[in-house]
């Protein structure tokens, strides 16, 4: 009996345990479902949190950009207010000058009117005085009246002429001063407009994109080249397109020609956005960040320019380095002052950093090298021309010596011929003159001096032989 109760009790306990187990399993399933829902909610919460963080970061960036643009707008507004103040001051000065000009013109017109009235009154008084004088001295001789009137009116006429000249000189001087003042005001307005345009261009260039900054750098580079004395198209060329292969070309900003066929390339596409932030920022932390970005921009441009390898371009006999031009002098100085090792880093990439001042010194040196080269070439040409001239003179001297020898030979032949003609025994002149003594008639005789000298040296044997010949009938009478 007790065993049956024990077994029944065990069955009851087993059923209770099974029920408890089922309840526990149901509780576990419920807890697992709850856990899954909680995990899903947790993942959704994390996703929402990440979205919120992203939105927060985007909003923070927008706030920073908004603050940056607000600062830029404030700076531009300050510049605009300053420019407006300058314009207002200049307009006030212009109004003041205009008022002074108007007052001067009115005063001049009043002076002119008073002078005309005075001249008219003086003329009337002179006429009345002349009339009274003529009336009082009407019975005097006309010549005496005329002389007296001239003596009386001549000083007054001279005074009037001098007064008129002074008035004319005063008007002329005032007109010239008015013209000069107007010209200076116009120049002041033009200078103000030019300064405003240049300031606006510089601001746009520093705040613009890389293309705009590159164009600004090329403008500054062109001014430095112009100041150096080099000539475009002769000692330097701009925007030369160099063909590398069938599909690619490179176009350096400037190629400067050196003596002896060498070249040097100048690049002017430096970005100065970070330097603009450094220059305009008033916060030291922002200035430090902008300065580091400026240095990083310099290093990046050095590496990019080194990869272009301009000094190895085909058709160029370039030096082993390229000049990297930084168009704003303070941007160059602040970088070198902060990190002097930038110069050595650039040289390792075959790059030499230059500012407007250092580039101008280098270009002036190149100008002097070209001047010396031209002088050397001129000296070489002079030496070549001198050598050719010396050869010409030598040939001329040789020809003159040959001509002298020919003249000496001709003179010797002349003397020999003259000796045969009029000197010595049996000379021709003496023989033909003997024909005259024999009665031969001639139209014109030979020169008496030559004939006398020839006859004196002529031997009488010739005459005897000639007489014998005559007796023999060779020369009949």
From Swiss-Prot:
GO BP: any one term: DNA recombination
Keywords, ordered alphabetically: Coiled coil, DNA recombination
Source superkingdom: Bacteria
Function text: Involved in DNA recombination.
Gene coding for it: rmuC
Protein name: DNA recombination protein RmuC homolog
Coiled coil: 1-211
Keyword Nucleotide-binding in record: no
Pfam family, one: RmuC
Region span, Disordered: 458-477
């Amino acid at each position: 009996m007790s065993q049956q109760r024990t077994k029944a009790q065990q069955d009851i306990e087993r059923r209770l345990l099974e029920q408890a187990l089922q309840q526990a399993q149901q509780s576990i399933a419920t807890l697992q479902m709850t856990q899954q829902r909680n995990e899903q909610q947790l993942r959704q919460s994390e996703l929402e949190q990440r979205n919120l963080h992203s939105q927060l970061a985007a909003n923070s960036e927008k706030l920073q950009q908004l603050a940056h643009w607000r600062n830029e707008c404030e700076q531009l507004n300050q510049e605009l207010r300053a420019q407006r103040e300058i314009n207002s001051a200049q307009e006030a000065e212009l109004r003041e000058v205009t008022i002074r000009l108007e007052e001067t013109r009115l005063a001049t017109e009043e002076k002119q009117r008073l002078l005309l009235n005075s001249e008219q009154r003086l003329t009337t008084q002179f006429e009345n005085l002349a009339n009274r004088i003529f009336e009082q001295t009407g019975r005097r001789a006309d010549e005496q009246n005329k002389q007296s009137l001239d003596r009386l009116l001549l000083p007054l006429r001279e005074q009037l002429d001098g007064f008129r000249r002074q008035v004319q000189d005063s008007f002329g001087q005032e007109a010239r001063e008015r013209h000069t003042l107007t010209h200076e005001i116009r120049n002041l307005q033009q200078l103000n407009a030019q300064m405003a345009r240049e300031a606006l261009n510089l601001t746009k260039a520093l705040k613009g994109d890389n293309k705009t900054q590159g164009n600004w750098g090329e403008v500054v580079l062109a001014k430095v080249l112009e100041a150096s004395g080099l000539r475009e198209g002769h000692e330097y060329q701009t925007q030369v397109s160099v063909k590398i292969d069938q599909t690619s070309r490179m176009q350096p900003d400037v190629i400067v020609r050196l003596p002896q066929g060498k070249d040097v390339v100048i690049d002017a596409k430096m970005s100065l956005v970070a330097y603009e932030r450094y220059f305009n920022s008033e916060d030291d932390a922002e200035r430090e960040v902008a300065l580091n970005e400026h240095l990083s921009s310099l290093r990046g441009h050095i590496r990019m320019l080194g990869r272009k390898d301009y000094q190895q371009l085909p058709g160029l006999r370039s030096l082993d380095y390229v000049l990297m031009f930084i168009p704003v002098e303070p941007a160059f100085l602040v970088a070198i002052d902060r990190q002097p090792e930038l110069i050595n880093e650039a040289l390792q990439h075959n790059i030499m950093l230059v500012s407007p001042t250092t580039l101008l010194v280098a270009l002036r040196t190149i100008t002097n090298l070209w001047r010396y080269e031209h002088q050397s070439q001129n000296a070489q040409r002079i030496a070549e021309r001198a050598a050719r001239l010396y050869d010409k003179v030598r040939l001329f001297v040789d020809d003159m010596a040959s001509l002298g020898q020919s003249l000496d030979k001709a003179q010797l032949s002349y003397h020999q011929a003259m000796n045969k003609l009029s000197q010595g025994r049996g000379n021709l002149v003496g023989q033909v003159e003997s024909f005259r003594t024999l009665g031969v008639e001639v139209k014109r005789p030979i020169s008496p001096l030559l004939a006398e000298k020839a006859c004196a040296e002529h031997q009488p044997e010739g005459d005897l032989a000639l007489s014998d010949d005559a007796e023999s009938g060779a020369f009949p009478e």
